C-alpha cells in the first residue's frame, strides 16, 4: 500500500514537473515571437520580428543608413528611432505598425512616406524638419502622442520646417488633426463620409461649405459653388505645450470670396476650446453684394481691413477700404 502511494506521489510530481517545463517552454516561445532584431548591410537597415521595436533600438545620427525596411510583424517604431539620420532617404512601413514614435524620422532626408491606414498613434514631430519631404500618405484619424515634460512649444507631426507639399489621408479625417499638419495641399480619402478635397482645400462632402485651408497657403480662392464661408477654415488654432494658442494660417495674405457665397459663419467647425485667434490678411475680395453688416464686420475685424467692393463702402467705412 505504501509502495502504491509512493508511486502515486512520484507520478504526480513528475506530471507537475513536465507541466512546468512545458509551460516554461511555451513562455519562451511567446517571448521569442516578440523579439525584434535588425541588420545593416550596404546602407539598408532591415528590422524584423514580432512585436514592438525595443525602446533602446535607436539609430539616431547614423550616417550609414540610407534605406529602412521594416518587415511585417513589427508593431511600432520607437522614440527618435531614426532622428537626424541625414542620409536616410527611403522608408518602408508595414501594415502591422500601429504606433510611430515621437520624432521617429525627424530631420531625415526622406522625400515621401506612406503611413499604413491601420496606424493608430503618431508621435509629435515624427516628420519634423524633413527638408526634402514632399508627400505624405497617412491616416486622418490618428491620435497624436505628445512628449511628457518637454519645452518644445509646437505640437505638430509635420512642421513648417518640412517641405511638405501634399498630405493624402487614407482613412476618414478627424478634423482637429489638420492643426498638426503643415502642407500646401490636403487630400481627404475618397470614401470620407464628411469631407471632400477641391484643389487641395477641404470642403464639406456636398461642396457647399469650406472647412479647412492648408497652413502653407498664401492665397485662398474659395471655389465657385460654395455657399458658406466658414471662417474656422482659416482661423483654426494649434496649442503649444504651455497652453497658448496660435493661428495656423498666418501665411495667408489674400482671400477671394465668389458670388456663390451667401453666408459667413465664424464658429462652425471649431475644434479647439479657446476662441479663434484673429489674423490679418492683406486683401479680401468680395463678389457677393448682399452680405449683411455683421458678416462684413466679422470679415474685417477677424481677417483684415482691405475689402475690395465699392458698393459696400457705405455700410462699414471704418472696416472697409476700397482699392
Residue ranges and their predicted role:
Residues 11-21:
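Bacterial N-terminal signal peptides
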Residues 149-151, 159, 180-181, 268-273, ...:
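A structural signal for leucine-rich repeat
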Residues 19-35:
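Sec-dependent signal peptide cleavage junction
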Residues 41-51, 63-76, 86-99, 108-121, ...:
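Structural signature of tandem-repeat unit edges
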Residues 1-12:
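Bacterial N-terminal signal peptides that target proteins for export
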Residues 56-61:
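Short amphipathic alpha-helix with an adjacent loop that forms part of the alpha/beta core around
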Residues 36-40:
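Boundary/junction segments of secreted and surface-exposed precursor proteins
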Amino acid at each position: 500500500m505504501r509502495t502504491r502511494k509512493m508511486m502515486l506521489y512520484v507520478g504526480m510530481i513528475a506530471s507537475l514537473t513536465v507541466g512546468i517545463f512545458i509551460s516554461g517552454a511555451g513562455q519562451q516561445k511567446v517571448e521569442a515571437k516578440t523579439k525584434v532584431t535588425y541588420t545593416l548591410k550596404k546602407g539598408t537597415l532591415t528590422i524584423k520580428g514580432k512585436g514592438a521595436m525595443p525602446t533602446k533600438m535607436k539609430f539616431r545620427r547614423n550616417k550609414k543608413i540610407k534605406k529602412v525596411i521594416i518587415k511585417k510583424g513589427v508593431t511600432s517604431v520607437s522614440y527618435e528611432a531614426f532622428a537626424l539620420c541625414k542620409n536616410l532617404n527611403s522608408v518602408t512601413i508595414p501594415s502591422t505598425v500601429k504606433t510611430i514614435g515621437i520624432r521617429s524620422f525627424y530631420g531625415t532626408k526622406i522625400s515621401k512616406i506612406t503611413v499604413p491606414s491601420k496606424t493608430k498613434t503618431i508621435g509629435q514631430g515624427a516628420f519634423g524638419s524633413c527638408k526634402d519631404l514632399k508627400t505624405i500618405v497617412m491616416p486622418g484619424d490618428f491620435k497624436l502622442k505628445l512628449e511628457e515634460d518637454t519645452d518644445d512649444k509646437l505640437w505638430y507631426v509635420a512642421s513648417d520646417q518640412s517641405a511638405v507639399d501634399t498630405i493624402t489621408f487614407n482613412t476618414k479625417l478627424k478634423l482637429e488633426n489638420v492643426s498638426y499638419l503643415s502642407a500646401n495641399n490636403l487630400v481627404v480619402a475618397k470614401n470620407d463620409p464628411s469631407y471632400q478635397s477641391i484643389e487641395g482645400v477641404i470642403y464639406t462632402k456636398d461642396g457647399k461649405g469650406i472647412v479647412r485651408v492648408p497652413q502653407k497657403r498664401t492665397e485662398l480662392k474659395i471655389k465657385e459653388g460654395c455657399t458658406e464661408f466658414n471662417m474656422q477654415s482659416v482661423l483654426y488654432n494649434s496649442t503649444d505645450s504651455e497652453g497658448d494658442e496660435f493661428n495656423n494660417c498666418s501665411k495667408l495674405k489674400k482671400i477671394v470670396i465668389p458670388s456663390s457665397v451667401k453666408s459667413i459663419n465664424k464658429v462652425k467647425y471649431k475644434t479647439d476650446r479657446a476662441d479663434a485667434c484673429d489674423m490679418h490678411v492683406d486683401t479680401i475680395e468680395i463678389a457677393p453684394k448682399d452680405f449683411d453688416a455683421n458678416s462684413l464686420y466679422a470679415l474685417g475685424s477677424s481677417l483684415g481691413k482691405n475689402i475690395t467692393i465699392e458698393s459696400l463702402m457705405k455700410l462699414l467705412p471704418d472696416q472697409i477700404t476700397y482699392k
